[in-house]
Swiss-Prot record:
Top-level lineage group: Eukaryota
Complex formation: Component of the NDC80 complex, which consists of NDC80, NUF2, SPC24 and SPC25.
Gene, per the UniProt record: NUF2
Localization (cell): Nucleus; Chromosome, Centromere, Kinetochore
Coiled coil: 184-298, 343-380
Function: Acts as a component of the essential kinetochore-associated NDC80 complex, which is required for chromosome segregation and spindle checkpoint activity.
Record keywords: Cell cycle, Cell division, Centromere, Chromosome, Coiled coil, Kinetochore, Mitosis, Nucleus
GO cellular component labels: Ndc80 complex; nucleus; spindle microtubule; spindle pole body
GO biological process: attachment of mitotic spindle microtubules to kinetochore; cell division; kinetochore organization; meiotic chromosome segregation; mitotic spindle organization
Cited InterPro entries: Kinetochore_Nuf2_N, Nuf2_N_sf
Predominant location category: nucleus
Family: Belongs to the NUF2 family.
Protein name as annotated: Probable kinetochore protein NUF2
Length: 455
């Protein structure tokens, strides 16, 4: 990305602008494929047009001054003729560098004269074209009474130019006197030469002072010129901004008040609709928050119910284990009873009857506890089912229904298992009672038989 403060122009636009500035040498072919001779000639014309300085004339003035000097200076100058072309290029390079630096390009070098690059040449010429446009626009703005600062600037510039011309005239006069004194040096009158030499030295000192004053004034003039150009550029930017603000205000002033009021009413209505929609969304958000909290509470209660059911299931397993132990004990008692019958010990029959009665009481208590737990679980399930039906959202109902169905199926399975265990237990008790009855009958018969035998 270029860091220049001016736009890079297209070649047709660039050529048109340069030809409008009387640079007829600038053609599309020459700009696209620049040669050293083309750029040197074109840059000389540009420097002569915009700075009023001709590099060739500067070198010619220097040569004329040396040719009119003494013999030693003439010999040095003759030796330097060998490098005359090089001096011309170096002088042009120095002047071009200063000129392009003033218009915003700081990387001009001597290779841009010897071996010009098409892109760099286009960039330099774009800077010249933009500078020419800026000068033309600035002169149009400064023309007449439209810009008082511009008028003062032109008057001050004319004044400085007049002073500069006067000082150049004085400088030329002093040069002519020096030349005359050099001619006097060729005479044989030693005293006249010494007097003329002193006068010449005095004039030279005065000339040096005038030259220094001229240099200081010229530098001051350049600084003043640069300051005025900066002020002019700033005023141009301010003018553009003010024109833009004026166009905006004019647009607003031409707008119909009824249209503005209608737009305000439409915007107010739109604002009210947006506020109503916002309130609805906030209410929906609150409802969702309440539903979410209810769902969390229901989920927590469901977890607690599952824990209770799990505890009940563990109790059922424990009771089942107790029943199995009781069954095992009954079977063991049956075996012991058979052993007692075979051994003829009647005392243990009474103990067996007591154990049987104790097991019946435990079985009755177990049935009562089981019925109480079943009633409590049924009431809890009914309450949970009612709460799920009334409070939970339809999506959550499906989830909870699956949980409740699973729990109900589990409880039903356990109830069925408990009923089966109870039936088995009742059957075993009946079987034991029948066996006990048969045993009593056998014992009675046995005792009767023994009594008959003893009697």
């Amino acid at each position: 990305m270029s860091s220049d403060n001016f736009p890079l122009l297209d070649i047709p636009e660039l050529v048109t602008c340069l030809q409008e500035c009387d640079f007829s040498l600038a053609t599309i072919q020459n700009v696209e494929r620049p040669s050293s001779q083309f750029v040197i000639t074109l840059y000389k014309q540009i420097i002569d047009t915009f700075m009023g300085v001709s590099p060739d004339s500067l070198l010619e003035d220097s040569r004329n001054f040396v040719e009119n000097g003494d013999t030693s200076e003439q010999e040095v100058y003759d030796a330097s003729l060998v490098y005359h072309d090089t001096l011309k290029i170096l002088a042009l390079n120095k002047i071009c560098y200063k000129f392009f630096l003033d218009i915003g390009v700081s990387d001009f070098n001597v290779m841009d004269l010897y071996k010009p690059d098409p892109h760099r040449t286009r960039r330099f010429l774009s800077a010249v074209a933009n500078y020419a446009r800026f000068r033309e626009e600035a002169m149009l703005e400064l023309d007449g009474d439209q810009h008082p600062d511009g008028v003062r600037y032109l008057e001050q510039t004319d004044k400085l130019l007049k002073e500069l011309r006067l000082k150049f005239d004085a400088n030329n006069l002093l040069h002519s006197r020096v030349q005359k004194y050099k001619e006097f040096q060729k005479s044989d009158d030693l005293e006249a030469l010494e007097s003329d030499n002193k006068n010449m030295e005095s004039e030279l000192r005065h000339l040096n002072q005038v030259q220094e004053t001229l240099t200081v004034d010229y530098e001051r003039y350049k600084a003043e010129k640069q300051r005025h150009l900066s002020e002019l550029e700033t005023l141009g930017y301010e003018l553009i901004e003010l024109e833009s603000e004026r166009d905006k205000l004019r647009k607003y002033s031409q707008t119909d008040a009824e249209v503005l009021r209608k737009g305000v009413r439409e915007l107010s209505l739109l604002l009210e609709q947006q506020q109503v929609q916002l309130e609805k969304l906030e209410q929906k958000q609150k409802n969702l928050q309440i539903s979410f909290e209810t769902f969390q509470a229901s989920t927590q209660e469901l977890y607690e119910v599952l824990q209770i059911v799990s505890t009940d299931l563990q109790d059922s397993h424990l009771k089942e284990s107790t029943l199995l132990d009781a069954k095992h004990k009954l079977m063991q008692n049956h075996k012991n009873l058979n052993n007692l019958l075979s051994a003829g010990i009647m005392a243990k029959i009474t103990l067996l009857q007591e154990q049987l009665d104790s097991q019946k009481r435990k079985l009755a208590e177990l049935e009562l506890n089981t019925q109480a737990k079943e009633s409590e679980n049924s009431a809890t399930l009914k309450r949970l089912r009612k709460q799920h039906t009334d409070d939970v959202l339809p999506e959550v109902r499906n989830i909870e229904q699956r949980y409740k169905t699973k729990v109900a199926d589990t409880i039903t399975n356990y109830e069925s298992q408990m009923r089966n265990i109870k039936v088995d237990f009742d059957n075993e008790v009946a079987l034991i009672e029948n066996e006990c009855s048969l045993l009593f009958n056998h014992i009675k018969n046995y005792m009767t038989t023994i009594g008959e035998k003893l009697g």
